[in-house]
């Protein structure tokens, strides 16, 4: 049931449309057994709260309604009205945790599946699709994101903006305007989603009992659309120069809160109070507007800032849809009732919507500058193609032909200028092929060369980007100058021919480029369709099961950061997926075979999941290797085109192409009110009813889906950054070219400055020499002193000029180094772009891997689905058996209570049953003690094994050290033997040498004594060495101190472990004796137990079974409560994981945003550098020549004007002296003579060029000031009655001459600025005329006074 938007010409009455959306019960609510208190009837547009509270709305959306259906029903008509020029607003209202942010689509856009995207992404995708489909529509889209936190504004797109800088004002039409909010121009869906994520990361959120990430502020996401070039259907066509401006507000209100329920304290309490006060003000406005009895009374818009923002949306100039979000839980009955009451009142509000036409002149200068920089690319292409018609060149021969030729030249220049700007943008575009890029680059180089040639050849008005009006004025002036005009016409004709040739080349290059764009767009569209088809196939083949442990495989990205406000897929089976199979009521008294089968299913599922993970990882590695090899063979990955930039990677266009009446592709989670009871039955209902086997997505499939979404988001973000980097590279290339051109000019300028500096230095040296000569002589008179003073002034001026030239040279050298800096930055940016492209390629490979893994998962899930069906049949059979057993037990209980056998159980029998129950409990305790003793014995044995293993390790280490000590001892013994043998040998040698000393000659004795000393020294060293070795052997220090200490510690540790092992052995021996004794006793007790049980009657046996059945039920209930607490803890863990993931994503997005802001600043810097380089180039080279010619022409015109005014002054003086007796004939003669003299004066001016003479300047300054005062007084004096305008005899004859004079000369009474007069004084005196001035007629004076 959609909202029908009325579209009538002019203003129309548009009631506020109200849609009601009911979210499903949350897992936590299901866990605690909350019931639904709402009954929805979407076909009738009715909803019932409780039993008898009925409400009707335009649209009612149930729990199973998906996001696509919400968009089609609520926002699609508003988007159509938005494009027709109406303002539109959609705002979500409701309590906290009711799904407002999820419905609006502001929460975690990147981590949500495509079918779960909210209103804002879908509306923006549809808007850009409509813009792209209409080529003739010239649109400009701005977005802003504002937050209202504690009644203070905060710009989420420019967080640094102070709150006081954002003001709420009203324009002259009464519309509410926000001043100081940053508006960002966007060209595609990716940019909008990126800005939305950036603002969402900066938004105020906090944790309450209802929501871990609850919105603590109101947000307003505004989209402004400016349209030109067409008129909406059924609306009057506007006048020329108007544009269509419409705004779309997406308002996400913070939820109303009950402080006792949310548990807010401290800062959260203050936020809750502020939120409730603003919502109360909004409720008062809705009540005042919706109450028919209060029509015309005061509306309290100014009670809150949010009501002032929504002033146009509620009762003003807008079409508004209110989406009321409610919770079906019975615990939120009062909040749901309040929301329904407010929504019901809002249906009575009537708005007056009008089409917003605005004159172009009212646009702000910033928008004009943005439009001048260039419209979106596809619209520029359309305009250039439509203007590319060939217009025949007119022939030369008359003024009309000259004017037509000038107009044609202006059009060609405009065309070429547009082509130049378009090709510059096209060159910066990443998807341009190599051949087309070379053609575009050659064409741009040729245009820049022609521009410089024309600038140097024909003055400042010959550039390609000159204004058409200036060209026409220059052409019109040149057409009136005879031979010079003919030459100008020939030049313009050649320029027109050349420009047309360039235009044809440009159109050919443009067609090639557009063809390449079309081919690339088709290929990418096919890839997107394949991705969508695979995704749909995956969604259709995604079964699940109710096995335990599924939460452990869920990735953090599979949850949104706002867990309690979104209708999660499978939310009602969340608790069943988390609970173990033992918690299900159907298994409480099931047979042992059923438990075994459940374990088998779990083991089989886990084994298949492990097998699938290993297979997918192996296949992914193989595919990654193959794709890397293929990537090396490729030259360059395909670049993104304009279509992708505007429509994003995700398949928004296919989804947005659904008609409003078509059913949505995907429904939300189907939940019936009876499902909570089936999911978590009460203890009283145990054993009754049927437990449905719910389905969930497999962990591997959800992980794959999450990775796929993350890869797509990463690709989109990287694509935006790559495009911005490429644009910056283009700016750097243009800056480099401009810097090179400026370098050439500066090199020439440096040479000229050096020559001028040399000349100035020579003059300075000469002046200093003359100054020294004059100072060396004694001044004789005043002339020499004045000459000396003049020389000093000239020397000071020359020195200052030399200093200025040095500074100019330094500045020029700094500019020369700008090119090298640009080259370095360009190389760095190219490396960054290559790195981003590699990352993009890796993400694309991951996309293909995930797609392949999805295909394999489909096959696996089909097998699992078949297995689940088999288990369902088996489960149903077991449930039937269980139901029969339960009915038998219930019948027995009834029979026992009612005494159907005719006899009442006596007190003695009851006591006997109690005794038997106690006896059984004692026997059970004995068995449990035996089992605990066995477990303790096993634990002791395990501990002993650990101690033994530790002792073994220590013993091995000790053995190693002892072996090392043994080896050291053996080495020392060997050293002692070797030293002893050497000492014996030395003793023998000493004795021999002593004998030779006694028997030898005197010469040999000296040599022998030296040898004896050497042998004694060696003997002493060996003795010392033997003493050291003996001391080591006696002390036993065969190891290092660290090793000795380690050996000592090992001995102590081994001794402690031996003691521990001895203690454990004793304890184990004792426990074994006790267990053997208790085992024999237990076997005897079991025999006694069986014997006693065999003696029990059937009634006693059933009574015992009932007692123990009640005990089992009690234990099961306790286990159920523990499981609920455990599930709540698991939910909290999941929420914390989501929060961590969301913060990580926000951090990564902030990094990307910082990189984008840096790129934008660098781009702006490069544009400013280009502007400075252009200005510098204009002031050098051709710019100086052009300026010199302009100044010379201006000086010449001023000299002529000054001469005319001086002649008029003399004439008026003679007229005053003669009086008013002159006749008409004398007036005619004087007038003709005046015209002749003026022509002679012009010729005289041409013969005598201006030359600066210092002696003329002072006299001319006084004369001109006096002439101006006298002529101004005389010209503005009243005329006599006899001087009539009709008395002019030559009025008709001189009309043509007057027109010529008016077009070429300023009026007589015009007072020149002082700068212009100063120019004429500096360039020389007025030539004296060679004729005597004569009187002029009164008619001539009248014409001079009133030239028009």
From Swiss-Prot:
Residues with Phosphoserine modification: 903
Predominant place of localization: other
Segments forming domain Kinesin motor: 15-349
Keyword Transferase among UniProt keywords: no
CDD domains in alphabetical order: KISc_KIF4
PTM section of the record: Polyubiquitinated by UBR3.
Record's keyword annotation contains Nuclease: no
Family, similarity comment: Belongs to the TRAFAC class myosin-kinesin ATPase superfamily. Kinesin family.
PANTHER family with a match to the protein in the record: CHROMOSOME-ASSOCIATED KINESIN KIF4A-RELATED, KINESIN FAMILY MEMBER 7
Name recorded for this polypeptide: Kinesin-like protein KIF7
Organism encoding this protein: Mus musculus (Mouse)
């Amino acid at each position: 049931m959609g909202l029908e938007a009325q579209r009538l010409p002019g203003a129309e009455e548009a009631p506020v449309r109200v849609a009601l959306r009911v979210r499903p019960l949350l897992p936590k609510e299901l866990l605690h057994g909350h019931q639904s208190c709402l009954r929805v009837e979407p076909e009738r547009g009715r909803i019932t709260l409780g039993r008898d509270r009925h409400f009707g709305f335009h649209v009612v959306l149930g729990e199973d309604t998906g996001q696509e259906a919400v968009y089609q029903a609520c926002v699609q008509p508003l988007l159509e009205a938005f494009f027709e020029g109406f303002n539109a607003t959609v705002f979500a209202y409701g309590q906290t945790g009711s799904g407002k942010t999820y419905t609006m689509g502001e929460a975690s856009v990147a981590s949500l599946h495509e079918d779960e995207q909210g209103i804002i992404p879908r509306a923006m995708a549809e808007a850009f699709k409509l813009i792209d489909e209409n080529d003739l529509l010239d649109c400009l889209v701005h977005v802003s994101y504002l937050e209202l936190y504690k009644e203070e504004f905060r710009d989420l797109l420019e967080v640094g903006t102070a709150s006081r800088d954002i003001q709420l004002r009203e324009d002259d039409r009464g519309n509410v305007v926000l001043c100081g909010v940053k508006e960002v121009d966007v060209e595609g869906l990716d940019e909008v989603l990126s800005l939305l994520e950036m603002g969402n990361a900066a938004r105020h959120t906090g944790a309450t009992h209802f929501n871990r990430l609850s919105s603590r502020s109101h947000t307003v996401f505004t989209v402004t659309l400016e349209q030109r070039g067409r008129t909406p259907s059924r609306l009057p066509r506007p006048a020329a120069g108007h544009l269509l401006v419409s705004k779309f507000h997406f308002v996400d209100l913070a939820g109303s809160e009950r402080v006792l329920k949310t548990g807010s304290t401290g800062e959260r309490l203050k936020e809750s109070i502020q939120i409730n006060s603003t919502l109360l003000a909004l409720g008062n406005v809705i009540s005042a507007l919706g109450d028919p009895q209060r029509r015309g009374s005061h509306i309290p818009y100014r009670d809150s800032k949010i009501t002032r923002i929504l002033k146009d949306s509620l009762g003003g100039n807008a079409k508004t849809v209110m989406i009321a979000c409610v919770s079906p839980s019975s615990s939120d009955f009062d909040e749901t009732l309040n929301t329904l009451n407010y929504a019901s009142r809002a249906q009575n509000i009537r708005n007056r919507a009008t089409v917003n036409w605005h004159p172009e002149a009212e646009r702000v200068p910033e928008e004009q500058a943005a439009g001048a920089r260039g419209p979106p690319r596809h619209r520029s292409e359309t305009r250039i193609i439509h203007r590319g018609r060939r217009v025949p060149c007119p022939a030369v021969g008359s003024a009309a032909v000259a004017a037509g030729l000038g107009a044609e030249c202006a059009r060609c220049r405009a065309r070429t200028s547009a082509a130049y700007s378009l090709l510059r943008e096209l060159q910066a575009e990443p998807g341009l092929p190599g051949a087309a890029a070379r053609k575009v680059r050659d064409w741009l180089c040729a245009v820049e060369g022609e521009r410089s040639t024309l600038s140097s050849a024909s003055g400042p008005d010959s550039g390609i980007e000159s204004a058409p009006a200036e060209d026409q004025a220059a052409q019109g002036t040149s057409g009136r100058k005879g031979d010079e005009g003919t030459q100008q016409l020939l030049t313009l004709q050649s320029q027109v021919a050349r420009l047309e040739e360039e235009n044809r080349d440009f159109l050919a290059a443009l067609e090639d480029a557009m063809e390449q764009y079309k081919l690339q767009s088709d290929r990418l569209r096919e890839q997107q369709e394949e991705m969508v088809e695979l995704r749909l196939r995956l969604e259709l083949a995604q079964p699940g099961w109710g096995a335990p442990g599924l939460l452990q495989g869920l990735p953090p990205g599979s949850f949104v950061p706002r867990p309690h406000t979104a209708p999660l897929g499978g939310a009602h089976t969340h608790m069943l997926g988390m609970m173990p199979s033992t918690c299900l009521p159907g298994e409480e008294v099931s047979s042992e075979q059923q438990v075994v089968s459940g374990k088998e299913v779990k083991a089989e599922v886990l084994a298949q999941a492990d097998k699938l993970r290993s297979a997918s990882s192996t296949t992914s590695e193989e595919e990654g290797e193959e794709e890397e090899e293929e990537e090396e063979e490729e030259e360059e990955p395909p670049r993104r085109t304009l279509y992708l930039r505007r429509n994003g990677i995700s398949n928004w266009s296919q989804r947005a192409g659904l008609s409003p009446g078509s059913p949505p592709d995907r429904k939300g989670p189907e939940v019936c009110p009876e499902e909570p009871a089936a999911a978590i039955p009460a203890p009283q209902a145990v054993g009754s009813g049927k437990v449905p086997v719910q389905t969930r997505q497999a962990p591997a499939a959800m992980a794959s889906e999450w990775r796929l979404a993350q890869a797509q988001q990463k690709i989109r973000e990287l694509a935006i950054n790559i495009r911005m980097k490429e644009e910056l590279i283009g700016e750097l290339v243009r800056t480099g070219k401009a810097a090179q051109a400026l370098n050439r000019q500066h090199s020439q300028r440096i040479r000229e400055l050096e020559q001028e500096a040399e000349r100035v230095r020579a003059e300075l040296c000469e002046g200093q020499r003359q100054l020294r000569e004059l100072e060396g002589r004694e001044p004789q008179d005043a002339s020499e002193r004045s000459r000396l003073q003049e020389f000093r002034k000239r020397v000071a001026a020359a020195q200052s000029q030399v200093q200025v030239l040095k500074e100019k040279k330094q500045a020029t050298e700094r500019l020369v180094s700008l090119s090298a800096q640009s080259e370095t930055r360009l190389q760095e940016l190219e490396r960054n772009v290559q790195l981003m492209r590699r990352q993009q390629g890796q993400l694309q490979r991951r996309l293909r891997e995930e797609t392949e893994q999805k295909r394999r998962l489909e096959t696996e899930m089909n097998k699992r689905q078949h297995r689940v069906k088999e288990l369902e049949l088996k489960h149903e059979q077991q449930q039937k058996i269980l139901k029969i057993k339960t009915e038998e037990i219930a019948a027995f209980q009834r029979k026992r209570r009612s005494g159907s056998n005719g006899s009442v159980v006596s007190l003695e029998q009851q006591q006997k049953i109690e005794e038997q129950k106690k006896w059984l409990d004692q026997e059970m305790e004995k068995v449990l003690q035996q089992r605990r003793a066995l477990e303790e014995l096993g634990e002791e044995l395990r501990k002993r094994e650990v101690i033994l293993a530790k002792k073994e390790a220590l013993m091995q280490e000790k053995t190693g050290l002892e072996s090392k000590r043994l080896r050291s001892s053996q080495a020392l013994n060997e050293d002692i033997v070797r030293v002893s043998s050497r000492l014996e040998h030395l003793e023998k040698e000493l004795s021999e040498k002593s004998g030779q000393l006694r028997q030898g000659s005197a010469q040999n004795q000296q040599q022998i004594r030296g040898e004896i000393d050497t042998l004694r020294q060696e003997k002493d060293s060996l003795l010392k060495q033997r003493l050291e070795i003996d001391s080591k052997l006696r002390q036993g220090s065969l190891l290092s101190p660290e090793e000795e200490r380690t050996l000592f510690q090992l001995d102590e540790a081994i001794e402690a472990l031996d003691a521990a092992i001895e203690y454990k052995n004793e304890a184990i021996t004792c426990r074994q004796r006790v267990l053997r004794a208790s085992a024999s006793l237990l076997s005897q007790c079991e025999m006694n137990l069986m014997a006693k049980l065999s003696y029990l009657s059937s009634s006693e046996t059933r009574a015992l079974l009932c007692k123990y059945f009640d005990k089992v039920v009690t234990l099961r209930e306790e286990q159920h409560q523990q499981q609920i607490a455990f599930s709540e803890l698991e939910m909290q863990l999941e929420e914390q994981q989501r929060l961590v993931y969301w913060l990580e994503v926000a951090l990564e997005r902030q990094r990307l945003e910082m990189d984008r802001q840096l790129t934008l600043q660098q781009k702006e810097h490069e544009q400013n550098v280009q502007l400075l380089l252009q200005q510098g180039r204009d002031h050098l080279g051709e710019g100086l020549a052009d300026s010199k010619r302009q100044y010379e022409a201006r000086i010449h015109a001023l000299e002529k004007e000054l001469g005319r005014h001086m002649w008029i002054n003399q004439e008026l003086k003679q007229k005053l002296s003669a009086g008013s007796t002159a006749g008409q004939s004398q007036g005619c003669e004087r007038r003709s003579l005046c015209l002749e003299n003026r022509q002679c004066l012009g010729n005289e001016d041409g013969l005598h060029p201006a030359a600066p003479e210092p002696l003329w300047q002072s006299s001319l300054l006084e004369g001109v000031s006096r002439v101006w005062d006298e002529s101004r007084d005389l010209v503005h004096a009243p005329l006599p009655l006899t001087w009539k305008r009709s008395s002019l005899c030559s009025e008709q004859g001189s009309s043509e001459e007057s027109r010529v004079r008016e077009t070429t000369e300023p009026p007589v009474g015009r007072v020149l600025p002082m700068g212009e007069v100063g120019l004429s004084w500096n360039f020389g005196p007025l030539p004296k005329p060679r004729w005597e001035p004569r009187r002029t007629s009164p008619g001539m004076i009248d014409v001079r006074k009133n030239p028009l």
